[in-house]
């Protein structure tokens, strides 16, 4: 575990510990006290006081990277070059250029690299997508209120903003269902050089469309609606339905572990993450033009 991120405390530590094919070995943090508190329920795991020492540890096979967005590329590449497989938290990078550099590093190292889009591993979500017949329109929304001014999601240098944080989910699921978009229209409300709210209209071949909406200044909103030949399909909490009853984080960890142990392709290949970042880049550009 690279860093003592809150997502580790809330979901990923338990998922690794419960996985059938993985073991929680160590957490590196520049705040050893915080890391120690997080690892208290996992007495076999060690606190390591530098990221470099974690990457050099021969007992570590896989790095989970939940660092702030602007550090994804640097530390993912450093981990790959150190001979570690990497599960990198979403969004994969700051932009498509960074994503391509990460993918190139993975190829050069011969190690596995996957973006941690856990929602794609939830059995109910997979069943929802697989039962769709001839989808023609997707509406995906994800928003909440970021109240703490010190929240890194509100800091432009750290890759803050609604589009990268929660819009990455809306874009990912739209592309999962409809494929790659053509023309894109978008608008954003900018404050302190970050998008507090972004909305976009994505055009696909065959006159199919997707409406995506992401916000850091709204009441909780998380919905997915798909218009298809068989009718209108809706799913609430498509991105955060944890442990009901299966834990998508654990399923994601086990899937990545299977790829590592058996040298199988990862479920979400780097090419998919590059394509998602490319669409996010295009939405950002369209929203500010």
What does each of the following model-derived ranges do?
Residues 171-239, 254-260, 264:
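Contiguous beta-strand/loop segments that form the cofactor/metal-binding neighborhood of enzyme cores
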Residues 8, 49, 88, 113-115:
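Hydrophobic residues in well-ordered beta-strands that form the structural core
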Residues 33, 42-102:
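Beta-loop-alpha module in the N-terminal Rossmann-like domain of NAD(P)-dependent dehydrogenases
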Residues 62, 205, 255-289:
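C-terminal helix-rich "cap/oligomerization" subdomain common to oxidoreductases
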Residues 1-42, 289:
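N-terminal Rossmann-like dinucleotide-binding module
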Residues 45, 82-84, 109-112, 207-208:
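A short helix->loop->beta-strand "cap" motif at the edges of active sites that frequently abuts
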């Amino acid at each position: 575990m690279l860093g003592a991120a809150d997502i580790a405390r809330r979901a990923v530590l338990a998922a690794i510990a419960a996985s059938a094919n993985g073991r929680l070995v160590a957490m590196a943090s520049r705040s050893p006290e915080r890391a120690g508190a997080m690892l208290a329920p996992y007495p076999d795991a060690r606190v390591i006081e530098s990221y470099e020492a974690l990457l050099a540890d021969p007992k570590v096979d896989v790095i989970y990277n939940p660092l702030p967005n602007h550090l994804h590329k640097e530390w993912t590449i450093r981990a790959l070059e150190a001979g570690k497989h990497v599960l990198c938290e979403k969004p994969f990078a700051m932009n498509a250029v960074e994503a391509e550099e990460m993918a190139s590093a993975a190829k050069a190292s011969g190690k596995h690299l996957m973006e941690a889009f856990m929602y794609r591993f939830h059995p109910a979500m997979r069943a929802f997508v697989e039962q769709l017949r001839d989808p023609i329109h997707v509406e995906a929304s994800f928003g909440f209120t970021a109240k703490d001014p010190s929240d890194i999601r509100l800091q432009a240098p750290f890759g803050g903003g609604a589009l990268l944080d929660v819009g990455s989910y809306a874009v990912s699921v739209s592309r999962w269902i409809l494929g790659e978009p053509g023309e894109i229209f978008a608008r954003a409300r900018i404050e302190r050089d970050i998008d507090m709210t972004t909305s976009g209209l994505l055009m696909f071949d065959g006159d199919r469309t997707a409406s995506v909406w992401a916000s850091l200044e709204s009441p909780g909103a998380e919905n997915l609606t798909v218009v298809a030949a068989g009718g209108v399909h809706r799913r609430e909490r498509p991105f955060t339905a944890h442990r009901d009853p299966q834990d998508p984080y654990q399923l994601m960890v086990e899937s990545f572990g299977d790829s590592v142990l058996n040298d199988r392709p990862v479920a979400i290949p780097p090419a998919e993450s590059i394509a998602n970042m490319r669409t996010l880049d295009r939405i950002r550009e369209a929203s500010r033009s």
